[in-house]
Amino acid sequence: MAIGQPFATALGCTIIWRAAGALFGPPAAGDYQGRFPMLFSQHTRLVHVDSPLGPEVLQLQRLEGREELGRLFSHELELVSSNPALPLDALLGKPMSLALELPGGSRRYFHGIVARCSQGAGAGQFASYQVTLRPWLWLLTRTSDCRIFQNQKVPDIIKQVFRDLGFSDFEDALSRSYREWEYCVQYRETSFDFVSRLMEQEGIYYWFRHEKKRHILVLSDAYGAHHSPAGYTSVPYYPPSLGHRERDHFFDWHMAREVQPGSLSLNDYDFQRPGTRLEVRSNVGRAHAAADYPLYDYPGEYVQSQDGEHYARTRIEAIQTQYERVRLRGCARGIGAGHLFHLSNYPRLDQNREYLVVGAEYRVVQELYETGNGGGGAQFESELDCIDAGQAFRPLPSTPVPVVRGPQTAVVVGPKGEEIWTDQYGRVKVHFHWDRHDQSNENSSCWMRVSQAWAGKNWGSIQIPRIGQEVIVSFLEGDPDRPIITGRVYNAEQTVPYELPANATQSGTKSRSSKGGTPANFNEIRMEDKKGAEQLFIHAERNQDIEVENDESHWVGHDRTKTIDHDETVHVKHDRTETVDNNETITVHANRSKTVDRNETVRIGMNKTETILMASLQNVGMGRMENVGLGYSLNVGMMMNTVVGLNQSTQVMKKKTLSVGDSYEVSVGGSDDGSKITLDGQSITLGSQRIELTADREILLRCGQSTIRLTPGEIEILSPNVDINC
């Protein structure tokens, strides 16, 4: 093949690249690095390879590459070397760059990490090697983690992941503001999938700016993050019929439009504002007949409407990037994904506008030295996938979102020294067993709601899980970012309250006093269901308060024992009835006081015995009446004193006997009216060794018509007949 002859391939652009060593003619077999060392030199080639093995060890024969906004680039290289035994491990994971010669003498670089390399059987005098270049971001597909991020914005989370893995070749070109995520979980996924799905949700994408020694990931979200490469602000279109052109140009154009949904609505729920409507909607207007079909999704992953509007807009913009695509094929060597350019010279004038390259494919072929022309022929072709520069680009969600496929257990955590750590909603924080990054404290997770047996408006049941207890955590929609506690379980450290299986028939609730409670400090309601030993046990560690707003009934089938170690107060605001069908015994070891504000009636069906070991005092404010149906007996062991403040009347319907063992004295304090004793009967007998009657004014003895009157001055005897016997 003559020097300068085009290389016959299907590629559309042939670049004539003359080799300086071609003037010597074709070398002999095996003589490329011997007699003709200049022939294995890269300075004569369109694409230069800079590998970890050195600048002249590997040379490019073929390149097929693809890059896309928000996606990992991949460049497949066919390389040749005069060394058939290159150490592949010296390439794996190392950076490698390609330098593509541009018009005017500048260069465009393709830089990447060797993700894969292999060796084939070779072709002629050269060994054949295959290398795949990927961005450093691709290495994140080779690492995974389970990790929690709290109170961070997505760009900060992404950059933290990059830095933690040792990467710093990135640039923040974001222009929008982003909300702070209270809780974000990387769960059983690669670090690449994690940051990718976060970017897709927030409408962030990336592309790579290539330099000789590195490639830089550019985080982007708007037009301002992009630029036109030098010399490629405007790129013309030349149809194939016009033949070869010296300047870079496009020779093939294809535009397609596709019906896409015209609007997207999102909705979500915020338990802190359960009555607030959070539905949002975003529209994109198009002029065709089927532009109004709506999409709806739930949950939208937000609790503030403005955040929902951002997500709805982001998602509908991602869909609308598929509405119109323009594909341009040609040999515009300096343009790649993330670049802007203006198309010119296309016959349809409305297509001569500014475009953003969202995807690019490259193909480069360089001749082998064994063709005899020194490797001078090379061809380059690119195919660009473009959107109108005025159309916002957003990545379509394609990264799988991790789904927690069942409940998990976790341990309740909190600050050091606390036993219960909760907020106004009864939420708690936990440490997941898979989390190797936290310190098992109050910062281990977000606040998690706790399922209760009953939940009403200021009513229901509540039991707050305590620090150290193991709980069951479920996830709403399987989303690791939306945990909710649905149960609790025992373990070997937090074990059951009753010894099992010996007490398998026991069930109940037993608490622990806090703070500083010991096993001896608890409240408990326990049921024993063992046949023949059934029991309901209630233990209050301190106070027990029972409120019954209407009736209360108690039934005890057998005995009841009640022991109160201190005082008891019973206050019955209306009537009280107490019935004892058999005997009742009341023992008061000290004093007893009883007050009846009005009447009291005591009825004893048979006998009453009252024993007072010492004195008895009874005060009656007004009258007192005792009715005894038959006998009445009063025994006083020693003295008895009866005091009547005014009058006293004793009435005996039949006989009365008064027996005094020793002396008997009746004293009547005088008055103007005098005193009177009336004894009616057949006989009154006074028997004594001495009887004395004393009166200050008069003593009168009367029997029938006879009287004896004694006054201080005289004794008068009146009788029909007086007999005095001496």
UniProtKB/Swiss-Prot annotation:
GO terms of biological process kind: protein secretion by the type VI secretion system
Highest taxon of source: Bacteria
Family statement drawn from the similarity comment of this UniProt entry: Belongs to the VgrG protein family.
Phenotype upon loss of function: Deletion of vgrG1c shows residual type VI secretion. However, simultaneous deletion of all three vgrG genes (vgrG1a, vgrG1b and vgrG1c) totally abrogates bacterial killing.
Gene3D superfamilies: 2.30.110.50, 4.10.220.110, Baseplate protein-like domains, Gp5 N-terminal domain
Tagged with keyword Transferase: no
Keywords: Secreted
Region Disordered, residue ranges: 502-522
Subunit structure: Forms homomultimers. Part of the type VI secretion system (T6SS).
Protein name: Type VI secretion system spike protein VgrG1c
Protein location: Secreted
Function noted in UniProt: Part of the H1 type VI secretion system (H1-T6SS) specialized secretion system, which delivers several virulence factors in both prokaryotic and eukaryotic cells during infection. Allows the delivery of the Tse5/RhsP1 toxin to target cells where it exerts its toxicity.
Cellular component terms (Gene Ontology): extracellular region; type VI protein secretion system complex
Keyword Secreted: yes
Regions of compositional bias (Low complexity) in chain numbering: 507-518
